[in-house]
Amino acid sequence: MVRVSVLNDALKSMFNAEKRGKRQVMIRPSSKVVIKFLMVMQKHGYIGEFEYVDDHRSGKIVVELNGRLNKCGVISPRFDVGVKEIEPWTARLLPSRQFGYIVLTTSAGIMDHEEARRKNVGGKVLGFFY
């Protein structure tokens, strides 16, 4: 399999395991961006606990799934988004205003669109989940 994006492969394997009804999934290779993305998903309750396993190569992550994930994906290329431009992106990517999150990488770290709006920072769109 050709690896286009580590984050894309991680989210696709999670989404496929969720559709199959699996309780956990192993993601490899691992990266800091994948771990931060999973932290945002865990904070909002879309996944359970996850554990990083160091195999002295690229690392693995074992994620506990809880059945709440409907869809997740990566936006490529990573478009620049200002604070005022977050709203059109939420309308385009998410099914409704109260449902789902867009994950941004900002100068203040990787966070969801609501936290970025509260902190008044823009950044690049990494992906979304709902």
Swiss-Prot record:
GO-annotated biological processes: translation
Name of this protein: Small ribosomal subunit protein uS8
HAMAP family given in the database record: Ribosomal_uS8_A
GO molecular function: structural constituent of ribosome
Domain of life of the organism encoding this protein: Eukaryota
Recorded family membership: Belongs to the universal ribosomal protein uS8 family.
InterPro entries xrefs: Ribosomal_uS8, Ribosomal_uS8_CS, Ribosomal_uS8_sf
Keyword Ribonucleoprotein in annotation: yes
Keywords linked to the UniProt accession: Cytoplasm, Ribonucleoprotein, Ribosomal protein
GO cellular component, one term: cytoplasm
Entry's localization field: Cytoplasm
UniProt-listed NCBIfam families: PRK04034.1
Major localisation: cytoplasm
